[in-house]
Amino acid sequence: MRYETEQIGGALVVKLYGEIDQHCVSEIRDDIDRQIAIRNINSLIVDLGAVEFMESSGIGMIMGRYKNMVSRGGKMMLVRPQPQVDKVLELSGIKKLFEKNCG
């Protein structure tokens, strides 16, 4: 798992690559939370275009960042999920949540 972050105005864009599993989520989670806290971030955009696999720990990481952004009055978007990741998002119910609240 590899990731990159970039701030564009008040948005933090996080590009994830590879597999999201229990071995990598704590590092990603902690770094994203740190960047949200120290920068003036009001939107979090998570680019899933290069994610090949995601397990339940990835779902937990996404939901935790969503709750963090909502508690700050911000918003979060998931963009470009690959078909297999999109299916995980759909089965977990997260896809519906993001379509409804983050369009």
Question: Where are the language model's segments positioned?
Answer:
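Amphipathic alpha-helical interaction surfaces in cytosolic regulatory modules
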Residues: 22-97
